[in-house]
């Protein structure tokens, strides 16, 4: 007998006015505060004291977050934490992992090389 071990829905959205919103978010990311931490094989601003753009993210992407809130049937939605990863070598990666059984996790590719 086969049964489902867990259910993992995927919500995917096309961002309206992507160029403007991308530029707005990139302007809030302090690129000088990236570093390697612990065993991580990527650079991040996760541990930077200047990483305080979750409210900016909510404002910039309010339409898309509202769409997600309705589709996920949520009464309340708040971005609790946000950080950026930066890969500069082909060997850098972020391994699959989970964030416990509460809440949602989002992923956005701001800049990438579509040839890789």
Task: Name each model-derived stretch.
Residues 7-9, 78-80, 102-104:
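Residues at beta-strand starts and edge strands
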Residues 1-76, 93:
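Non-heme Fe(II)/2-oxoglutarate
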Residues 74-86:
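A short glycine-rich, His/Asp/Glu-containing loop-to-beta-strand
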Residues 1-2, 80, 108:
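Detector for methionine-enriched segments
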Residues 84-116:
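Catalytic core of non-heme Fe(II) oxygenases with the double-stranded beta-helix
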Residues 58, 62, 81-84, 103:
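Generic internal hydrophobic packing segments that stabilize the cores of diverse globular domains
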């Amino acid at each position: 007998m086969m049964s489902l071990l867990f259910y993992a829905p995927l919500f995917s959205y096309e961002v309206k006015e992507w160029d403007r919103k991308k530029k707005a978010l990139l302007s809030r990311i302090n690129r000088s505060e990236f570093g390697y931490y612990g065993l991580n094989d990527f650079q991040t601003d996760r541990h930077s004291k200047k990483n305080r753009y979750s409210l900016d993210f909510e404002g910039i992407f309010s339409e898309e977050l509202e769409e997600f809130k309705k589709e996920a049937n949520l009464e309340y939605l708040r971005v609790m934490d946000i950080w950026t990863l930066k890969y500069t070598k082909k060997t850098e990666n972020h391994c699959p992992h989970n964030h416990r059984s509460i809440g949602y996790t989002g992923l956005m590719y701001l800049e990438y090389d579509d040839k890789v």
